[in-house]
Amino acid sequence: MEENSIKIHKWLYPASWLYGAGVALRNKLFDWGKLQSKSFNVPIICIGNIAVGGTGKTPHTEYLIKLLHDEFQVAVLSRGYKRHTKGFILSTAESDARSIGDEPYQIQSKFSDIRVAVDEDRCHGIERLLTLKEPPVEVILLDDAFQHRYVKAGLNILLTDYHRLFCDDTLMPAGRLREPAQGKNRAQIVIVTKCPPDIKPIDYNIITKRLNLFPYQQLYFSSFRYGNLRAVFPDCATVQERKLSSLQTEEQILLITGIASPDTIIRELEIHTRNIDLLAFSDHHNFSQRDLAQIKERFGKLRKGQRLIVTTEKDATRLICHQELDEGLKPFIYALPIEVEILQNQQDNFNQHIIGYVRENTRNGSLPERKDAHKS
């Protein structure tokens, strides 16, 4: 296993101890029943982590949607981080990243046949989703809600980054943990994400021992598989889609990211070209007119004829909102999609674990198979 350098600010340990005491007390109040977790009569799957930063929650949520939506009526509920609205909003054709948040909008854009909603109050959001009819919601995916213990999810999936395992980290602000590592015990499934494709068998064993999970917990490993570059503004682009392998070594790329950790996408692009100019913003960054001007300036410095703007799907949702974006840039902007791959030949086991939970925890104990369901 490759050595990962995790930056710990030791001088902030006293603040971390105070923070940890507060979080531990809150968790104990839930464990003792002093703070109430609410159960709902519908299968609820929570996807989250115990660290700040990107662990791949949205790609894993999309994996679950693909797995479930042919057989069940799926709804996704998020708080809609950095949206410009408040309260419960059910996504419609008029929704955008500003009204529901970049990640919910990305999901709705890719899966128009499911319900996507946002609400800071997850209990209220679930109650609203359960009032929907024609057809009723059959399973709810909670995005980034591992610490939201007011909802008692039936299945908790905890993600941890291969390059920053929670067992190597410490509490904020000295580290990046939202809660003590013991919080992992609430998860029924733990996934080590962003694994290198060539991860060695011995690394699986080392990580398994270090995470020290209980027998009731299932451990899986996943990696990212990148798709073809897709035009963000297809009406303006001469080429709608490009394979990564079509990139030439002399091609110059302006890479725009507003995600927590752009390292994986950089490594993927560097396989094809080393001419990468990175313009990195903070996670969920709302692009300003000044940012758009900077993008135009940086792109203008690249050699004409062999240049491209690449961004993530999440960042693309925020760029699309901007009427101020220079029209001359639009034909050159492409998004790089990400798909999740379950490693160790464990994909079938993982899929059956998820589907089995949903089938066993429906309102009637079982659901009739939908006529449009794909046979597996």
Curated annotation (Swiss-Prot):
ATP binds at residues 51-58. InterPro entries: LpxK, P-loop_NTPase. SUPFAM superfamilies: P-loop containing nucleoside triphosphate hydrolases. It comes from the Bacteria. Pathway: Glycolipid biosynthesis; lipid IV(A) biosynthesis; lipid IV(A) from (3R)-3-hydroxytetradecanoyl-[acyl-carrier-protein] and UDP-N-acetyl-alpha-D-glucosamine: step 6/6. Keywords: ATP-binding, Kinase, Lipid A biosynthesis, Lipid biosynthesis, Lipid metabolism, Nucleotide-binding, Transferase. It catalyses: a lipid A disaccharide + ATP = a lipid IVA + ADP + H(+). Belongs to the LpxK family. Transfers the gamma-phosphate of ATP to the 4'-position of a tetraacyldisaccharide 1-phosphate intermediate (termed DS-1-P) to form tetraacyldisaccharide 1,4'-bis-phosphate (lipid IVA). This is Tetraacyldisaccharide 4'-kinase. The lineage of its organism: Bacteria, Pseudomonadati, Bacteroidota, Bacteroidia, Bacteroidales. The gene is lpxK.
